[in-house]
Amino acid sequence: EISECLVGSEMCIRDRAPDMQTQNEYRVSVRMHRMVPDSLSWGKEPIAANPAGITEQKQKIVTLGDNILLFTQNSDKVYSTTIPAGSPTDRLNYGQNWELKNATLPEGADVTSIIRFDEKLYLLANNKVYNSADGLMWAEDAVLTPSGATVSNLITSFSDNDGSNHKKINGIASIVEKNGQKYFSFAEKTENEWNITTGEEIVPTEFPVNNLSADVYATESGTLNAIVVGNTADGLDNDTATVVWASEDGKAWIPMEIPSNNNCPKLVDPSIIHYNDAFYICGKENKDDAKGFQKFYTSPTLLVWKGVDRMFMLPGILPPVKLEGGVTQYPYSEYSFKGKEVNYTMVVDRNHYIWMVGGKGIDKIWRGRVNKLGFLIQ
């Protein structure tokens, strides 16, 4: 016989044996999350001020080991905050304090070119590749420059650390220039050496040329895919959309576009992430009726995009407030990205936190995460 009762806020279930003497008692407690699981939460205020102060210079935020590093163009000052040990469900709290560290970046370093591979950072300075194990001390990496060529772009890297990598592709994808022409190149890291493969097809003029933003993710089949966006060259015909370029090996890149009215609009300094099983792009718009940051754009396939008007919002757009008379107010922080045309940089850390750093006009650091990525599922 089974009977039910309530004990406080818990449901009590009693299971009695046929002799009516032996019984087991079970108590069930249902816990309700007060947060909307699929909502991106940034908090009401930025988590910290931009430690570089009021700057119009380009910046780059990256993760390296247990640290998040913030670089500023034309500066040897690097700011660092530590990611504490633990898992995303441990209610970790960090990012309020940033420590100043002095670096020795090479002359002409382009901080927007920084990528991470195999627990090292790589950047370009005057078309030469440099690497660093800590982001502070940098050394030229002549091996990564093919003979008779210069490196014009570091695109991204493929690594076992990115997820299931059945093809065992580990290395750095770049663009090199030879005899006045640009080609895709891939430096594959083996146990003891680099093997560099340079393609024969010229890089399309539509491929992004600067301020690249890339992400690498594992597919359901266990292979890695890389995606990249960025600023394109001036004067291109029909350049009215932000097109994602994708690659399975770093050697060949294809544009993910189809004739459609549902393209991602043309954005300045676009950033792309694969997050919570979807793709997101943000950047600055340049429409007559919409300047600066407006919203995230999302796609499940990289081909058809739509603007996000709820749940996954830009930092500083606060929850709507219902006033008397049925009027709904849509408040936002003075440090919101909405409508701003500032320089910015963005990264996702291992705890699924999205970090967005704004330059002059915002000068703040925001940290956000989709709520359910911090839930403990039992």
Regions found by a protein language model. Name each.
Residues N50-V62, A103-D118, V143-H166, V203-E220, ...:
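Repeated scaffold domains used in trafficking and secretory/extracellular systems
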